[in-house]
Amino acid sequence: MKKTYAVITGASSGIGMAFARQLAAEGYRLVLIARRENRLQALAEELNKSGTESMIITADLSEKEACYRLMQQLEPVPVGILINNAGFGDCGSFLETDADKEMQMIDVNVKAMHLLMKLMLRRMEKQEGGYILNVASSAGLLPAGP
């Protein structure tokens, strides 16, 4: 088992879940973060059965204060990797998509990723090491959404 934890946002499904399973197979301890506690709990139970130490934190990263709370919760945790994976998209005609949903999307996909990267990078600089992976989608290159 590795000494440090891998922190994964958006861990409850898709790419985040795949990262969790892969890093567990490589011996990392995990901090799994997402909005849906039931999905996080199911993943943590699956990984714990295979001997992986994992903890879950529910957070809505569209809220700036949730990012700061998350970093406070991580203070006692030896973090070696941050996988900044939380995000979502929307599709449809620009004039027909919901503006509030788009603002929330920007809050998660851009602002939360930026803030968590900045705060974790400061921490990693003090501890003289660590890795950050920011996950993005090619969907941003398509004409379907903001």
Segment roles from a protein language model:
Residues Y5, S12-S13:
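Conserved glycine-rich cofactor-binding loop
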Residues N38, T58-R69, A99:
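The beta1-alpha1 cofactor-binding region of Rossmann-like NAD(H)/NADP(H)-dependent oxidoreductases
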Residues S93-L95, K101-I106:
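Substrate-binding pocket helix/loop in short-chain dehydrogenase/reductase
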Residues N85-D90:
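Conserved NAD(P)H cofactor-binding loop of Rossmann-fold oxidoreductase domains
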Residues S137:
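Residue(s) in the substrate-gating loop at a strand-loop-helix junction
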Residues I83, L116-M120:
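Hydrophobic positions on the long internal alpha-helix
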